Regions:
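Alpha-helix initiation/capping motif
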Residues: 10-15, 47-48, 54-57, 151-152
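A near-ubiquitous, low-amplitude feature marking generic local secondary-structure context
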Residues: 3-10, 16, 140-143, 153, ...
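Long, contiguous internal "core" modules enriched in hydrophobic/ aromatic residues
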Residues: 24, 43-51, 86-251, 257-267
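Extramembrane terminal tails and long inter-domain/linker segments of multi-pass membrane proteins
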Residues: 1-23, 81-93, 210-227, 272-299
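A broadly tuned "polar low-complexity/structure-edge" signature
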Residues: 10-13, 17-20, 25-38, 70, ...
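Transmembrane-helix bundle segments that line or gate the permeation/cavity pathway
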Residues: 1-2, 21-39, 53-85, 102-114
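Juxtamembrane/interface segments at transmembrane-helix termini
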Residues: 38-45, 71-81, 146-147, 198-208, ...
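Generic secretory/membrane-interface signal
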Residues: 9, 16, 20, 61-62, ...
């Protein structure tokens, strides 16, 4: 039957790209927005405001590139991706529309800035769209999903924490060498601790809730152990140890943790989708095993 056919290798890629795009762009925008508008010295505020407006173009282009890649892979193998898309949870609704409104708001502000001047009130509206978009997508994945492995508060927590991490490393890069560097380092340190605790809570849930979640856990620690190792060791433990070393022992550059956290968050999004299984996939796996057994008996 078609419903039990092997899924396309590209089936999950559009969702990975779209979710990572939302986390990256909204996180970076929110960081630059808060860094700018929580500055109370006039000279520094004006300097950061100019940087904020110039960064909008890059944030917008990043969102468009990821969104375009998601559409490309969505239609690359249209029969397979269409079938898989119909089985996905209804996440392409309000939260996705808010994300498109967020990108549209960025475009309008970019045009206004180059033609006349930035419209200050629009910045606050865009920030609300960014926050609403990521909170909405986090809630949708953790509440309205058909995957047992997603229906847990740790799903929303992981998405929100990942968004903050991506935004904070962007701030660490943009304001390297300033007084904000250590502020961002402390924020990243706190978020990394929360992410480790979230991962621990998620593993407890996966190991106890149902057969499907136990299968997901076996996939994470079995066929996807290399990618999980990248996520856990390179994306969590190494930056945590490095930040503690820099903050308390040595005065090294904080920039190396940018790559660690970026790769770690990307690998987390990949694992989030490819390790999620439902009854359909279990049925396909069972049918495949039965076919292999029958073939072996005939031999």
């Amino acid at each position: 039957m078609e419903s039990h056919s092997k899924p396309s290798p590209y089936a999950k890629l559009p969702d990975i790209l779209l979710l990572f795009s939302q986390m990256l762009t909204t996180g970076v925008y929110s960081t630059f927005f808060l860094t700018t508008y929580l500055t109370f010295e006039d000279a520094i505020f004006q300097q950061r405001l100019n940087f904020y407006y110039h960064s909008l173009t890059y944030i917008f282009l990043t969102g468009i590139i990821f969104f375009g890649l998601a559409l490309f892979y969505q239609y690359r193998n249209s029969p397979e991706t269409k079938d898989d898309a119909e089985e996905e949870p209804p996440k392409k609704s309000k939260s996705s529309r808010l994300y498109l409104y967020f990108l549209a708001g960025l475009l309008i502000q970019i045009i206004l800035y180059f033609l006349v001047a930035g419209f200050e009130l629009l910045n606050f509206f865009i920030f609300l769209l960014a926050a609403s978009s990521i909170l909405g997508i986090a809630r949708t994945f953790s509440v309205k999903s058909k995957y047992d492995s997603w229906n847990h508060p740790t799903t929303a927590g992981g998405i929100i924490e990942g968004t903050i991490s991506l935004g904070t490393i962007a701030g660490l890069w943009a304001f390297a060498g300033t007084d904000l560097s250590r502020v961002f380092a402390w924020i990243i340190l706190i978020i990394l601790v929360f992410e480790i605790l979230t991962l621990w809570a998620r593993f407890r849930y996966l190991s106890r809730w149902s057969y499907l979640t136990q299968e997901t856990l076996q996939m994470l620690l079995g066929s996807h152990i290399a990618l999980f190792g990248v996520r856990f060791i390179f994306g969590l433990i190494m930056p945590l140890v490095y930040i503690v070393w820099v903050l308390f022992i040595s005065n090294l550059s904080l920039l190396p943790i940018i790559l660690m956290i970026f790769v770690g968050e990307l690998s987390e999004r990949i694992l989030f989708f490819i390790a999620a299984i439902d009854q359909t996939q279990i049925t396909y796996k069972s049918n495949e095993n039965i076919s292999e057994n029958i073939g072996g008996e005939q031999e």
